[in-house]
């Protein structure tokens, strides 16, 4: 089994990689890649519908996209990670973004916008201490354990978009 760890930031990726190298053996092989925070952004109103471009007209309100779309905010980084995923022959991905709602949103907005289908494991660790990361690597959880947090992250982002428009 081979997986790709997707960390929220390079410093976290390096910490996890160090724990993996020193904390084995593990029943899987891992490669590593890092986001740089938010790689994706929610589409702007005009990217859904040209008539939603500013200045806004009362007859077009409320602006409610269905479905909400995410687009690359950092195209070179998205392309680099997607190339690694496509060429890596991975059996699964590891969501190693921060252990909180926003971390879920960063990972899943990337995953869904890029139509990824690989199974996902969750590395859940709120510190970067090597010993804690080793324990978390030995106890990767199924992504479905965090479905509620994933949904909450998207509801929050959609609400913010609607309230801001």
Where are the regions that the model predicts?
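Intrinsically disordered, low-complexity regulatory segments
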Residues: 1-165
